[in-house]
Amino acid sequence: VSVIDFRTAPERYRHWQLTLDGAVATLALDVDPAGGLNPGYELKLNSYDLGVDIELNDAIQRLRFEHPEVGAVILTSANERVFCAGANIGMLSASSHAHKVNFCKFTNETRLALEDASAHSGQTYICAINGPCAGGGYELALAADHLILLDDGASSVSLPEIPLLAVLPGTGGLTRLVDKRSVRRDRADFFCTVEEGMRGKRALEWNLVDEIVPRSKWQGAIAARAGEIAATSDRPASAAGIAFSPLERTIEGERIEYANLSCVIDRDLMAANIA
């Protein structure tokens, strides 16, 4: 079994574009279709696998700790036709049960890390939804603090897992709709049965998003909202960030050695000893 390497850095990202502009950062999803973590599937329509989320998690942590000057983060798509189609179905169908379980756990932890950066580090996330935003894509958007939907007749939000796959959303979709956004339970249940999702005014009326903006005003509205939110942040903008140095480690058999700790895996006991 190949070892999944969680070490990355912005200059090595294949799926995200990270830009910094004073107090505002932008994370734009631009998935490389041929950049799957494993062979056998294509990451179409800005869908994601574990490799995409490893980069997202790295970016969230770096923005939080390396960049105290950043008070607002715009989460958007670099693809004009789609925001995010969610978890890649080809990847899921080709993966073992264990990989799918760990994939879902990691993606959940990444979204929780985003929310934690907002709750405890004063870094507000704005999701600028500029295309169809489905399944795990909308679940990622729901982790943000403020959702802005492009009102162009094509951009939409949806949780189509039930009508398309006969499974419940697996990355907090229903929970965040009801508990975080206070969407009525009957509406949340109905929304999950609508394959095409909802657009424009209806999405706003149901509190699925916070704002809708026409294409003619899109760029200006996103920049203005991000600037307003960044101006209210209490982050210590003049402080020095905590630089993430490369995490070096060696692997020999079932032993992993880092500079300050070691880990020995016992596969028979399904245990890991860390010292």
Which residues does each PLM region occupy?
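A generic structural signal for short coil/turn motifs at secondary-structure boundaries
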Residues: 36-38, 93, 100
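A generic fold-level signal
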Residues: 68, 84, 120, 135, ...
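A structural preference for short, pocket-lining loop segments at secondary-structure junctions
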Residues: 22-29, 49-98, 108-128, 150-154, ...
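Short acidic/His/Gly/Ser-rich catalytic and metal-binding motifs that mark active-site loops
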Residues: 28, 34-38, 82-86, 158, ...
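Short, glycine/charged-enriched secondary-structure capping and boundary segments
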Residues: 42, 88-91, 140-143
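Intrinsically disordered, low-complexity segments enriched in small/flexible residues
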Residues: 1-76, 180-199, 204-206, 210-275
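Conserved catalytic cores of soluble enzyme domains
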Residues: 98-237
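Generic, ordered loop/turn and secondary-structure boundary motif
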Residues: 14, 46-49, 84, 90-93, ...
